[in-house]
Design a protein with these regions (language model features):
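Conserved active-site loop/cleft motifs that coordinate metal ions or position small ligands
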Residues: 266-267, 292-296
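Catalytic domains of carbohydrate-active enzymes that cleave complex glycans
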Residues: 345-363
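Active-site mouth of glycoside hydrolases
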Residues: 1-236, 242, 247, 259-260, ...
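C-terminal beta-signal and adjacent terminal beta-strands/loops
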Residues: 303-306
C-alpha cells in the first residue's frame, strides 16, 4: 500500500515531541459511547469531561484515546461534527491531544440478548464491566456481529472515516489516527480484514500529517502467523499494541516490536487484577519511551474497574485462579475524583515530569 511513512519520518515525528502518555477516556457520567457523543445530555457531559480532563492534565497526561460512535455521526451528523470539535477544543485547552479511533471489533454475537444500538437514554446495569450484564466483555461461542458486514452500511462507514480524517488531517489537536480497535476480536478473524484494509486505503488517500496505526492485540509473539498482524505491521506508520499481560510479557513484546525499527506505543494497558500494574508498567514505558494510554480514568457508569464478565465466567468454570479480585481492574480515580491509590498517581506524576525534563534536554 502506498503512503506508509518511512522509518526516518516516523522517528522524526515521534522524537519531535515529549513522551506521549494518557488514558482511554470517557467521562464518568457516560454509560457508553453513545452517551459520550449524542446530543442528549451532551452539555452536562462536556462539563464533566472538562473537569476530568483538567485532572488528567494535573496528573501529567498529555493525550487521550477516544473511540467514536458511528451511529451518532450517522443519525446526528452536523451536531456530531460540532460536538467532536468542541471535545477536541476542551482537551486541547488542557494541553491534551486526542488519538481518534474508528472501527471496533469488540462486539457481541447477534443472539437472543443482542439489541440494536439506539440514540436516547442509555440504560446500564451496576456491577458489570462496560455497564451491561450481557456485553462484548464476556465469552461467546459465536462470531461478534457488526453492522459493517452489510455492504450498504459499510459504505457509510467509509464516508465517516473519510470525512473526519479530511476535516482534521492538519489539526494538531489530533495526534494519531488509530483506524481500527482490535481487528479480528470477538471471533471475527479474517471477516474484518477488508474493513481494516479499506480504512487504511482511505487514510493513505488523504495523507494526514498525523501517523496512522492500528494495534496488534493477540498472537503478537508470532505475528507472521496472523494475517491481520502482518498487515498492521506492514502498513502502520508507528507500531501500536495492546497488552494486559505481566511486566515480563511486556518486556518480551516491546523487544520484539522494536525490532521492526519503528516507534512503538501501547494504546491499552492496566489490569491490576491480572498483574499489569501502574507500579511496574508506567516506569517500563517511560524507560523504553513507549507512548502509553491506560484503560479508564475516573470510575463511572461504564464501570471498567470491574473485571471483564469473561473473567467471572472463567472463575466459575474453575479457571482464573491467579486473578486478584480484591483490586480494581482499570481506572485511576474514584467517583469523587480522589485517586484509587495515591501512590499510583504520585508515581505517574514523577515519571511524567522526568519525561518532560528529558525532552527539554534533547534526550
Amino acid at each position: 500500500m502506498n503512503g506508509v511513512w518511512s522509518k526516518e519520518r516516523a522517528w522524526e515525528w515521534y522524537n519531535s515531541r515529549t513522551w506521549l502518555r494518557g488514558c482511554n477516556f470517557m467521562g464518568s457520567d457516560c454509560a457508553n459511547r453513545i452517551d459520550q457523543w449524542q446530543e442528549l445530555g451532551f452539555e452536562q457531559r462536556l462539563e464533566t469531561a472538562n473537569r476530568e480532563l483538567a485532572l488528567a492534565a494535573e496528573t501529567g497526561f498529555n493525550s487521550i484515546r477516544i473511540i467514536l460512535e458511528f451511529l451518532v455521526w450517522d443519525k446526528e451528523h452536523d451536531g456530531f461534527m460540532q460536538r467532536l470539535d468542541r471535545y477536541l477544543d476542551t482537551a486541547w485547552k488542557h494541553g491534551i491531544s486526542a488519538m481518534i479511533v474508528f472501527g471496533n471489533d469488540c462486539m457481541p454475537p447477534k443472539n437472543e440478548f443482542w439489541k440494536p444500538l439506539q440514540l436516547g437514554e442509555q440504560k446500564y446495569d451496576w456491577g458489570y464491566h462496560g455497564g451491561r450484564k450481557f456485553s462484548q466483555h464476556q465469552q461467546f461461542g459465536g462470531m461478534g456481529y457488526h453492522v459493517m458486514d452489510d455492504p450498504a452500511v459499510f459504505a457509510r462507514h467509509e464516508q465517516w472515516v473519510r470525512e473526519i480524517i479530511s476535516t482534521y488531517k492538519n489539526d494538531p489537536r489530533v495526534i494519531i489516527w488509530d483506524l481500527y480497535n482490535e481487528p479480528g476480536n470477538s471471533h471475527r478473524e479474517s471477516v474484518t480484514m477488508p474493513h481494516v484494509r479499506r480504512f487504511f486505503e482511505i487514510a493513505r488517500e488523504i495523507a494526514p500529517i498525523q501517523p496512522v496505526t492500528s494495534a496488534l492485540w493477540r498472537n503478537i509473539a508470532s505475528p507472521d502467523q496472523d494475517e491481520i498482524n502482518t498487515f498492521l505491521l506492514e502498513n502502520s506508520d508507528i507500531i501500536s499494541y495492546h497488552s494486559y499481560g505481566t511486566y515480563e510479557q511486556n518486556i518480551r513484546l516491546i523487544k520484539l516490536l522494536k525490532s521492526h525499527g519503528r516507534p512503538v506505543i501501547n494504546t491499552e494497558w492496566l489490569a491490576r487484577m491480572t498483574h499489569n500494574t501502574v507500579e511496574q508498567m508506567f516506569p517500563l514505558f517511560y524507560l523504553e519511551k513507549i507512548g502509553c494510554w491506560n484503560w479508564g480514568f475516573v470510575a463511572g457508569l461504564y464501570q471498567t474497574y470491574e473485571p471483564w464478565n469473561g473473567v467471572w465466567q472463567q472463575w466459575e468454570q474453575g479457571g482464573a485462579r491467579d486473578v486478584d479480585f480484591k483490586v480494581w481492574f482499570h481506572d485511576l480515580y474514584r467517583f469523587n475524583l480522589h485517586p484509587y491509590d495515591p501512590n499510583e498517581i504520585a508515581l505517574i506524576r514523577k515519571y511524567c515530569r522526568l519525561a518532560d525534563e528529558d525532552h527539554a534536554l534533547g534526550l
